[in-house]
Amino acid sequence: MENVNIRVASPDDAEQLLKIYAPYVEKTAITFEYDVPTVHEFKKRIENTLERYPDLVAEVGDKIVGYAYTGSFVGRAAYDHSAETSIYIDEGCRNKGIGKRLYAAIEEISVAQNVINLYACIGYPEVEDEHLTMNSVNFHEHLGYKTVGRFEKCGRKFDTWYDMVWMEKMIGEHDEDVKMFVPFPELIL
């Protein structure tokens, strides 16, 4: 897709981002969330993410067509060089390279933050169904992620038990002389 602009999300984007996210909650097991958050709750999520991590949107013209962000992996200081990724693309804009562009930008920022390991927590169907396919796993594999763990039947949605896999991508070297994690706001000052 041409003319895609990637920029930092703002809490003011919450309503547009929620329009992208809501169908994932309502129709899929891609997220194990049951209830669509309010706009206020979504604004808070964006604000909380931006305190330490990037939250990016992809725009075509003035329409947001996707977003991706990273967040804390486990939430302890020893894990600062690891981050969890999330990505959501507008239903009508999938398979157009937007996700790949968003993740490329996320990886570039993560490297600048001295993040070395990226992780994705992905719903995994024993058998594909109308709510969950292998598309997310395949997308992440295409970008170099490897499956490193599988939790069986750990999430239940739409009266179905789903597995969850952790996928990992190393984007840096595990040197002894590791640099400190740099919070996202310090990169954009």
Summary of predicted features, one role per range:
Residues 110-132:
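Conserved GNAT acetyl-CoA-binding A-motif
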Residues 95-111, 134-138:
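Conserved acetyl-CoA-binding loop-helix of GNAT-fold acetyltransferases
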Residues 18, 22-45:
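Conserved GNAT-fold acetyl-CoA-binding loop/helix
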Residues 37-82, 86-92, 109, 113, ...:
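Acetyl-CoA-dependent GNAT
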Residues 5-17:
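A short beta-loop-alpha structural element at the N-terminal edge
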Residues 87-92, 96, 124-126:
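Active-site acidic-Proline motif in GNAT/NAT acetyltransferases
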Residues 121-123, 137, 141-160, 172-173, ...:
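Conserved catalytic-core motifs of GNAT/GCN5-like acyltransferases
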Residues 2-4, 63-67, 162:
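Glycine-rich phosphate/pyrophosphate-binding loop shared by adenosine-nucleotide-utilizing enzymes
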